[in-house]
Amino acid sequence: MTDAVTAHEMQQYDQYTINEIGVPSLVLMERAALAGIEVLGAGQFDLSQVLVIAGLGNNGGDGVALARLLMQKGVHVDLLFVGDENRAAHNNAIQLEIAKKYGLTPVNKVKDFRQYTVIVDALFGIGLSKPVPIKLGEMIKRVNAANVPVVAIDVPSGINATTGDIMGSSIRATATVTFAYPKTGLLQGEGVKRSGSIFVKDIGIYSPAELHQFNPEIKEN
């Protein structure tokens, strides 16, 4: 397994890929969504009734894209968008508009999470740096109590991607689809207990050192 990275390192590699290499951030978001679908569709999960929980950030944008792509494949999927759509990150807002144009209308609440056969967690990603708000923590507890398989996108929501600490409340995932490199927080502390099976997926983000192996003209740092 490739060496694990901290949240800060991953954010640097992400920005390097976008700003220096020139891969558009929306392309990375689509690839992340496709990677999630690859894990969901590998046979371990029942896709007859899927719920995707998406937050306001780019992790939520991954979730919105994933929900739309599932719908396009004929999967019955509900998209629970948590928060004010007007406050969504730029690329997340774009994904929302695309989803709506394809006919996927988000919902803003779910009465009973037990009605779903699998839940995709795209509420918080590696950028979480403060405790989960109490109201969202209560929702996370309801998801955990539903005893439905959960696939987390990048990290289980509420887990610090660097330390593995629980930031107030956290999802208990059956599986975690993480991108480019394992995150240190998935391999220590509560992160180990909350991540389930970890799938590391290549979506086109690399460290400068790794890119140097492809192209020696690229500086290693």
Swiss-Prot record:
Reaction catalysed by this enzyme: (6R)-NADHX = (6S)-NADHX; (6R)-NADPHX = (6S)-NADPHX
Co-factor(s): K(+)
GO annotations of cellular component type: P-body
A Pfam family the protein falls into: YjeF_N
Cofactor note as given: Binds 1 potassium ion per subunit.
UniProt EC number: 5.1.99.6
Positions of disulphide bridges: none
Binding site for (6S)-NADPHX: N58, N59, G60, G61, D62, G125, I126, G127, L128, S129, K130, P131, D154
Entry annotated with the keyword Nucleotide-binding: yes
One BP term from GO: P-body assembly
Keywords, in A-Z order: Isomerase, Metal-binding, NAD, NADP, Nucleotide-binding, Potassium
GO molecular function: metal ion binding; mRNA binding; NAD(P)HX epimerase activity; nucleotide binding
InterPro entries the UniProt entry points to: YjeF_N_dom (IPR004443), YjeF_N_dom_sf (IPR036652)
Binding of K(+), residues: N59, D121, S157
Domain YjeF N-terminal: 10-211
Family: Belongs to the NnrE/AIBP family.
Cited function: Catalyzes the epimerization of the S- and R-forms of NAD(P)HX, a damaged form of NAD(P)H that is a result of enzymatic or heat-dependent hydration. This is a prerequisite for the S-specific NAD(P)H-hydrate dehydratase to allow the repair of both epimers of NAD(P)HX.
PANTHER family: ENHANCER OF MRNA-DECAPPING PROTEIN 3
NCBIfam families per UniProt: yjeF_nterm
Descriptive protein name: NAD(P)H-hydrate epimerase
UniProt source species: Weissella koreensis (strain KACC 15510)
Taxonomic placement: Bacteria, Bacillati, Bacillota, Bacilli, Lactobacillales
